[in-house]
Curated annotation (Swiss-Prot):
Expressed in the central nervous system, in postmitotic cells of spinal cord, hindbrain, midbrain and forebrain. Expressed in epithelium during the development of non-neural tissues. Expressed in tooth development, specifically in mesenchymal cells differentiating into odontoblast in dental papilla, as well as in the developing eye and hair follicle. This is Signal transducer CD24. One of its GO terms (cellular component) is cell surface. Extensively O-glycosylated. The carbohydrate structure may be regulated in a tissue-specific and developmental stage-specific manner. PANTHER family: SIGNAL TRANSDUCER CD24 (PTHR16676:SF0). It comes from Rattus norvegicus (Rat). The keyword Ribonucleoprotein does not apply. Keywords: Cell membrane, Developmental protein, Differentiation, Glycoprotein, GPI-anchor, Lipoprotein, Membrane, Signal. May have a pivotal role in cell differentiation of different cell types. Signaling could be triggered by the binding of a lectin-like ligand to the CD24 carbohydrates, and transduced by the release of second messengers derived from the GPI-anchor. Modulates B-cell activation responses. In association with SIGLEC10 may be involved in the selective suppression of the immune response to danger-associated molecular patterns (DAMPs) such as HMGB1, HSP70 and HSP90. Plays a role in the control of autoimmunity.
Amino acid sequence: MGRAMVVRLGLGLLLLALLLPTQIYCNQTSVAPFSGNQSISAAPNPTNATTRSGCSSLQSTAGLLALSLSLLHLYC
């Protein structure tokens, strides 16, 4: 019973190590200093949209990996 608990704790820490960096990376925003010569545009930044969609797919992939490992651990 002690070994199973250690294995579950290790798996939990591994999942945390996999998911935490993706959360930190996806929540970072870059702020550009405002200059009086620049006009404010209402159009979205295409590079920002690409980064967000890539981040979303990375999160879903990490989530699927976590779910797969959890199910594997339960049934094996």
